């Protein structure tokens, strides 16, 4: 799909998300699913929830009714029939997972790279869904609560929303949501499940009806039984006998009759261990049981951590890890019906029912669980890409880290705050998930206070991250409070002039500016500059960077002349030490040009902007975003000086460059088009101004969140032109 384009009826069809495969021998469940497909029409919302059978008794197996498999069937049916052109599948176990899924879908649908926070991108996507004529289906699988969808409910006349949840109250808070309970198999559905799976040898079907009744028609239990029978010489009646004996053994030990699914998984484990003797099957199962059963990246099992866990030896960096033991175990476990492996994507994904995961965790000895948890944490860190080039992969890794944290908290805090917890939080920051990031770091800070001694280094790291998250979310006052705490702690533990203390002062100043306390920011940065000059030297690159920050604070405090003096000094130092064509030198020169313009020194500002533009074109290239931004700034300076023809001509060039490089719907392109329209208006070209503004308004409303300041500004400009016309 072309960059910046909005999909049309002729757009390329696409699917987003890691949709699970249909299970082998899947039954389309004609009795349970009757009417769901007919109800899933454009504009509809359907919720699949557990049937009443799953609320009965002491044991509650809400995750074992087959809701996800029915959702997969419905999605595949709509896709293959051509009823929808877009399928978005999201494992909606948290708000951050939904936000990440929407962001990926937004890029796939529009070709526009996200530029704002994840919340703003999600709002854009929801707005786009409401307006597009392209038929779509969004599946939110395993939604724990409607609170996760506050402001994120997808809707639109061309779309369908399908939700699966263990909470039957999910639909109650949303009008016009049709609820379909998914309970045990009917006899017909159960028989279909068995006979489809046992199609190779009809003799294995002997005793099928008796087995179905023995298993109580529980979907998960039947699927596991069918897998074991299909991979053995057993018939249904043989499995029924094994099942009855094992159920009695477990019931005597537990003091109550266990559910069918709590028995069948142990028989599946027995078969897997017969097929692959040794400890690897159990070790891998416990490892999987601690992670996110909705999707565990196969790359985790390619790590040295897992290799050592299974008995391998450590290898040097760059030396291939022996993958055979882990994948031998995974394939055997899959044959036994305890997991499924989704091979549809580039990298395999391992899936396991939450019911089976819970049973394995209960059965595993504490020492084995703890070792598996330590391995899982290390393997996740090993598999986590440093630069996170693929947002969906990062979202899946965060989900697995969250699952591990929920079941192995003590292990992750045994020696301070585990690096995995910090990595997961930084991943939220990278993904610009501002709201979830604040919540995550805030909870981690509370855990630090409860679990770590006062002054622990990890607590200070978390405090700094929480402050940064508050700042990114626009909560200046909260960011100031936490940065002050960080600075106080740093000052107690470190010597004066330590780089960490200086960095803390700079961060505090950033927060003070956002909080509207520019004068306090100037005070903090003057001290930071003095310390940096004393302990690093006046010409150190970091000292020069802090001086640039001080100049920015001086401008914010309305002391532009002081900012100009400082920037002039810093620029001279940069030219002497780093060279005139260093990127940092160009940045300082551009900052000086802006200050000169703000101070009314227009000719000097234009001269500086011209120099920056020439340098950036020579060093970075004409199409670099910084070069285009400089050209836009120079056009603004021309306008301020009254050189209207030059301003218009350069602004037109800037818009053309921005559309070509960034895309027509990029927020910077939209802002530059609005600026061009204002120049047209100032030049008396009302018709041209109106044409550009109307197009820009339409684009802003389509791709920016509701109430975005740029959209409001463009509307006001258009209204002014209409009034003058």
Label each region the model flagged:
Residues 1-446, 463-465, 470-488, 512-517, ...:
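Aliphatic-rich helical/repeat scaffold segments used for oligomerization and domain docking
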Residues 306-309, 325-331, 355-725:
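Intrinsic-disorder-linked linear interaction elements in eukaryotic regulatory proteins
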